[in-house]
């Protein structure tokens, strides 16, 4: 049990509220996936808010009593702190031990194992193939000789309902595998990383088979950008790239070209002096990819709003406001104006927050060839997966080579 002189510090965690009958719980989720989700009585929120690494457990209890927030004994506070520590929610030796174990396990494997199989999609290969064939039928017929398509934007929701219909409409007339040298996967990163990007030289595993990496390219990037793999562990919980990998294997199977998985974090949206790393990454990518036939796969979504994402409940007209904001952002992407897109994404909105995929989408807009053409397939809103209320803005887009201007005209 925690000592009265301990100064516990709660890690940065995702919180949500769960109503279970007459009971209200606060659910803690670790964005790094090191600790398993756990639920606590709502009264624990008062204690959680005070675990800043400055107060002892005795001082936490005293502050609660002075504020009249909740009457807990010192033993109750210490017991909750001990429970949080055991779960890996505190910034302490217990968490660092769990972190080291997860890192060793991840780094010692050549393939990034699927984390969401059996959760967001079937783990059994046959069941998964059936699910994908219903969502995106006839994958082989979606390959097209002479395709001018250079990239697609897809969501990473479960393969059903409106999300599946949007995927099927977007994934049309794709280039054949023999016409692609490399697939660059740009994925939304939900981790609180300090660096704008993280790459890996591991294959991405799926129940259907593994996507091949290109270690030589990763090594070339690391020579020029020594920090590019420093937060590689972020790939362990990369939901966006995992769902994209499943779709790519469904479409291309064993013929799938090698992939370069790139996680795009919120630091990629920083401006001014903080933009130096992003600029270096963009310039380096342009250099190392020169002459390659690259297909861009962007796994990103727009607004994530509501309690399911740790944000306030939407007002009566909240979904309409969400759609209007998302459509304004899409307008900037279609016009090929990444700076305007970022500016719109950074506008303060407490209810909606930043669009979830802003970093991946702004990176995409800067890496695609100047003058790229777009086709907006559709924009839809869907309810968040899980027990908490929330809404997600999904968009399907296709990107094409710039138009060729005939000098004789």
Predicted regions: what they are:
Residues 28, 397-400:
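Short beta-strand element of the conserved SAM-dependent methyltransferase core
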Residues 32-122, 126:
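Long, charge-rich, low-complexity alpha-helical segments
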Residues 110-371, 379-382, 402-409:
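Active-site histidine-anchored catalytic micro-motif
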Residues 381-390:
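Short proline/glycine-enriched turn/loop segments at secondary-structure junctions
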Residues 45-50, 386-387, 405:
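Short, surface-exposed linear segments at secondary-structure transitions and domain or protein termini
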Residues 390-396:
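Short hydrophobic/aromatic beta-strand or adjacent loop that forms the aromatic wall/cage
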């Amino acid at each position: 049990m925690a000592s009265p002189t301990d100064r516990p510090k709660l890690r940065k965690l995702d919180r949500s509220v769960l109503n279970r009958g007459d009971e209200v719980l606060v659910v803690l989720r670790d964005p790094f996936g090191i600790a398993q989700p756990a639920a606590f009585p709502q009264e624990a929120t008062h204690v959680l808010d005070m675990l800043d690494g400055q107060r002892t457990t005795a001082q936490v209890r005293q502050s609660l009593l002075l504020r009249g927030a909740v009457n807990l004994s010192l033993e109750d506070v210490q017991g909750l702190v001990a429970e949080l520590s055991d779960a890996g929610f505190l910034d302490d030796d217990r968490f660092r031990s769990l972190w080291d174990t997860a890192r060793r396990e991840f780094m010692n494997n050549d393939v990034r194992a699927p984390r969401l199989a059996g959760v967001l999609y079937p783990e059994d290969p046959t069941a998964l193939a059936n699910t994908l064939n219903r969502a995106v039928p006839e994958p082989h017929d979606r390959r097209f000789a002479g395709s001018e398509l250079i990239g697609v934007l897809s969501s990473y929701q479960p393969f059903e309902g409106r999300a599946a219909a949007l995927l099927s409409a977007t994934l049309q007339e794709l280039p054949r595998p023999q016409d692609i040298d490399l697939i660059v996967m740009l994925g939304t990163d939900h981790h609180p990383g300090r660096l704008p990007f993280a790459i890996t030289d591991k294959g991405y595993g799926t129940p259907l088979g593994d996507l091949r990496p290109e270690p030589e390219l990763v090594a070339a990037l690391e020579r020029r950008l020594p920090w590019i793999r420093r937060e590689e562990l972020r790939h362990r919980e990369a939901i966006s790239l995992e769902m994209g990998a499943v779709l790519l294997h469904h479409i291309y199977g064993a013929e799938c070209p090698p992939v370069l998985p790139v996680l795009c974090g919120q630091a990629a949206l920083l401006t001014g002096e903080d933009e130096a790393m992003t600029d270096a990454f963009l310039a380096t990518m342009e250099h190392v990819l020169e002459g390659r036939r690259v297909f861009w796969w962007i796994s990103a979504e727009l607004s994530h709003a509501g309690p399911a994402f740790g944000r306030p409940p939407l007002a009566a007209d909240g979904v309409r406001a969400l759609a209007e904001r998302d459509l304004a952002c899409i307008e900037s992407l279609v016009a090929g104006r990444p700076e305007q897109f970022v500016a719109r994404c950074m506008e303060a909105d407490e209810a909606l927050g930043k669009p979830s995929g802003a970093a991946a989408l702004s990176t995409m807009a800067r890496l695609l060839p100047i003058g790229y053409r777009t086709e907006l397939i559709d924009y839809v809103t869907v309810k968040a997966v899980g027990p908490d209320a929330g809404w997600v803005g999904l968009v399907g887009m296709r990107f094409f080579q710039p138009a060729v201007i005939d000098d004789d005209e």
